[in-house]
Amino acid sequence: MDVTKNKHDIVHRIGFLPQGFSSFDRITVRETLQYYSRLFSGMKSDVDGLIELVNLKDKAKEQYKNLSGGLRQRLGIAIALVNNPEVVFLDEPTTGLDPRARREVWEVLQGLKKKGKTVILTTHYMEEAELLADTVAIISKGEIIAMGPPGELIKNNTNYLVLTLQSGDESVFGVVHKMGFEPVLSNHKDIKVRVEHTDDVLKILNAIRDAGALYRGLDVRNPNLEEVFLKMTGEALLVDSVGGKGKE
């Protein structure tokens, strides 16, 4: 469909929640949805249904100014749905929310999927993309560099394990760095390195023991979407590295 020639049809077929969404302070959740629904002529929105969909039934009479960040985002999603769109665009809908509020928004988005809505979501949280998305597009410098189901992206772009060492001992980083393993993340608390085999884990642990260094705990797991993103974009999460910068 030509967007320039069919603007009216497009507006009625899509919904959009911008990043940094805000609304009118002194009107209630119900009044807010009623207001936005009136912007679409010839349509009658199911306001009660939208309130229930985003789990705001007990907040329907609450003014916008009294809502928490998570509740505001859920209201924003409801606003994006007032015209019953075929496709919903959500720009960073969980940015700045605490973990509990983020998960509440995730539940709403999963509910949209169950209702058959097509949701296009932008996010910097790879955990969020891995959990919610059927298809992920990784964008770097304005270009799509990879696209596919999260599981396939991980499987096709990784052939290693991730070892996490919980350590307050700065000498642990020096041991790992000297052995030449590729770091994923390093700070004063955790060291994450990529290893090809479980035998490499034993080599690292033995080297740490021989050096007299200490660690509090360890974890070995398969890579996740965040590691794929870092690998494919060439970006790193190395911060406060001890003994020099890690590889990027």
Predicted features and spans:
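ABC ATPase NBD Q-loop/coupling interface
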Residues: 1-9
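Conserved ABC ATPase "signature" region
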Residues: 34, 38, 44-59
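Hydrophobic anchor residue at the start of the ABC signature
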Residues: 77
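Catalytic Walker B motif of ABC-type/P-loop ATPase nucleotide-binding domains
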Residues: 88-91
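ABC transporter nucleotide-binding domain
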Residues: 106-195
